[in-house]
Amino acid sequence: MSNNTDLSPVHVIGGGLAGSEAAWQIAQAGVPVVLHEMRPVRGTDAHKTEQLAELVCSNSFRSDDAETNAVGVLHAEMRLAGSLIMACADAHQVPAGGALAVDREGFSQAVTARLEAHPLITIEREEITGLPPTEWGTTIIATGPLTAPSLAEAIAAETDADALAFFDAIAPIIHFDSINMDVCWFQSRYDKVGPGGTGKDYINCPMDKEQYEAFVAALIEGDKTDFKEWEGTPYFDGCLPIEVMAERGPETLRHGPMKPMGLTNAHNPTVKPYAVVQLRQENALGTLYNMVGFQTKLKYGSQTGIFKMIPGLENAEFARLGGLHRNTYLNSPVLLDNVLRLKSRQTLRFAGQVTGCEGYVESSAIGLLAGRFTAAEKLSQAAVPPPPTTAFGALLGHITGGHIVTDDEPGKRSFQPMNVNFGLFPPVDVPKPEGKRLRGKEKTIAKKRALSARALADCRNWLSLY
């Protein structure tokens, strides 16, 4: 680390996981940083301490398996990049099987201590109530899902009232290669060809009356998650949870998101489906499909069991399960460029969950990238995005435009927060053992290992550029 104290400081707003990581990366590159955190001057309903990088929910950073799990690959890439968050997590881990879980107090205290001790980091405990003044120059906004209302209003005014969401309505996402296409078929309703469409843009899963009635009953009986007190999230008709719709009457779903009109079963064209579940392409790669209209507050265990009742999804592998909760985040693919700058004001960069990533590790990773991009610019170097084959690049690609934009569901945003998963990675050729054809689980594991190995190799090459 070399000190460039003649440089004006970078300002980072928000001392959560992303802001802490961004500040660390910038300072480690030799650039001074001012980290602004509003706690304890102003608290939130979720935070309990004034520590930086406080974990407000789980203490788990999820799987640490860097061979067959995408978040484990992200862990490994972050360690390669000198992540403060991963270093403190490793130092304060607690037993959790194959997962990386931490002593939450020890972890946050360690992050705070490291940042406070860094000679190039100044921590200001104050609330930032609006967008930064122009004299601040380069600024990273990493204010997270509980962004203070005054700052959220300022961001909305700068971008667009429709560009900032305050709740996410998340439908489950399924890996395409786990869908049984002997049961399902491609078709848009009434074969409609929309912008960029072909008339065969949806995967359709048919149900007869008996299957539909059993499915509706399971939705109603399934275990639900309650809102946390601080979320205060209202239901609104544009994105009602699927189980709430089911409770409104036995026919509600088949006249709503599961209506069969305009669809003909390609495998059995003479039999009209009683109801149809539609899946829509989620990413440009075509590796992920989301369940249209299936935002839900069902507990995860209930979701997997109930949704596998759907014909064609009996062996479904979920890249993400559904949810509906309080979350302030940008319509990032529209607003941000490929190095996380606001297109309309390039001195502003966003990081963390406010960009539309989901999870502790993902938020930290985007903070890491924002920090590295910013430091490079301050040092008159090129800010080079990571390759899309890396976990860093796959996650960044989702945020800055890898999803498919749709306008066919009133009241819903097509861009929704996402955890890192292998469906975001470009496909890879899986090496086959000589004289052996891989099938089933063996093939899936081989594919994940190939994606992981490529990601880590490409990440090392990318890091050598900095």
Swiss-Prot record:
State the InterPro entries in the record: FAD/NAD-bd_sf, MnmG-rel, MnmG-rel_CS, MnmG_N, TrmFO
Please provide, in alphabetical order, the Gene Ontology terms of the cellular component aspect for this entry: cytosol
Report the subcellular localization.
Cytoplasm
Q: Which GO terms describe its molecular function?
A: flavin adenine dinucleotide binding; tRNA (uracil(54)-C5)-methyltransferase activity, 5,10-methylenetetrahydrofolate-dependent
Show the catalytic activity: uridine(54) in tRNA + (6R)-5,10-methylene-5,6,7,8-tetrahydrofolate + NADH + H(+) = 5-methyluridine(54) in tRNA + (6S)-5,6,7,8-tetrahydrofolate + NAD(+); uridine(54) in tRNA + (6R)-5,10-methylene-5,6,7,8-tetrahydrofolate + NADPH + H(+) = 5-methyluridine(54) in tRNA + (6S)-5,6,7,8-tetrahydrofolate + NADP(+)
Could you tell me which SUPFAM superfamilies the record lists for this protein? FAD/NAD(P)-binding domain
Q: Does the keyword Transferase apply?
A: yes
Q: Is DNA-binding found in the keyword set?
A: no
Cofactor(s) needed for function: FAD
Q: Where does FAD bind?
A: G14, G15, G16, L17, A18, G19
Q: What class of enzyme is it?
A: transferase
Q: Which UniProt keywords apply?
A: Cytoplasm, FAD, Flavoprotein, Methyltransferase, NAD, NADP, Transferase, tRNA processing
Q: Which Pfam families match?
A: GIDA
**Enzyme Commission number(s) of this protein:** 2.1.1.74
For the biological process aspect of GO, one term held by this record is: tRNA wobble uridine modification
Q: What does this protein do?
A: Catalyzes the folate-dependent formation of 5-methyl-uridine at position 54 (M-5-U54) in all tRNAs.
Question: What does the similarity note say?
Answer: Belongs to the MnmG family. TrmFO subfamily.
| UniProt name for this protein | Methylenetetrahydrofolate--tRNA-(uracil-5-)-methyltransferase TrmFO
Q: Which organism is it from?
A: Brucella suis (strain ATCC 23445 / NCTC 10510)
